């Protein structure tokens, strides 16, 4: 992140992670501190930022890379603080309720777009691998558009908007209508 800032280049972040292991070792390894540092650095970065949610975005690490100036998502991507199976196991002591938990969490791109977490959705077929070249071209066009748009705005305009986006993440309406 800092290198992009030092070189005066926009930062492009790709989010595609199943999340960290839910283990004592992960916590003892300083995961929470790294997530906090990433959030802090990204929010205050003095260069335009674009996050691209490609597939799964699970856990604090994925969420820490979300408050960019603009977020692009593949149509079938999803984002959650905890994978729906994990949430189901915690709440219901069974993974059988993962689809219901997914719906309640509003993890799909349609919900993320409606709630203002994603600004740009890139169309993909049932499996982007079936049309990899066309998908990559659409994704490239989306990235080019967002970077070009951001390059026209001064940092004095981008930073307050980025901070506002981050501060209001928890205040958005989720898919089941609850604020």
What do these predicted regions represent?
Residues 146-179:
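C-terminal alpha-helix plus adjacent terminal tail
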Residues 15-144, 148, 152:
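Conserved catalytic cores of soluble enzyme domains
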Residues 10, 83-84, 160:
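Proline-rich intrinsically disordered, low-complexity coils
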Residues 1-22:
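A structural preference for short, pocket-lining loop segments at secondary-structure junctions
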């Amino acid at each position: 992140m800092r290198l992009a800032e030092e070189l005066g280049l926009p930062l492009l972040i790709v989010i595609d992670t199943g999340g960290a292991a839910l283990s004592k070792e992960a916590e003892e390894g300083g995961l929470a501190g790294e997530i906090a540092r990433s959030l802090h650095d990204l929010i205050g970065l003095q260069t335009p930022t674009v996050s691209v949610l490609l597939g799964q975005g699970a856990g604090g690490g994925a969420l820490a890379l979300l408050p960019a100036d603009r977020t692009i998502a593949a149509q079938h991507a999803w984002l959650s603080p905890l994978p729906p199976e994990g949430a189901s196991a915690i709440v219901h002591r069974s993974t059988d309720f993962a689809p219901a938990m997914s719906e309640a969490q509003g993890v799909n791109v349609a919900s993320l777009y409606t709630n203002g977490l994603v600004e740009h959705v890139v169309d993909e077929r049932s499996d982007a691998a079936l049309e990899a070249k066309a998908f990559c071209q659409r994704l490239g066009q989306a990235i080019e558009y967002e970077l070009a748009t951001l390059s026209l705005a001064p940092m004095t305009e981008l930073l307050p908007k980025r901070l506002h986006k981050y501060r209001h993440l928890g205040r958005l309406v989720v898919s089941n209508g609850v604020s």
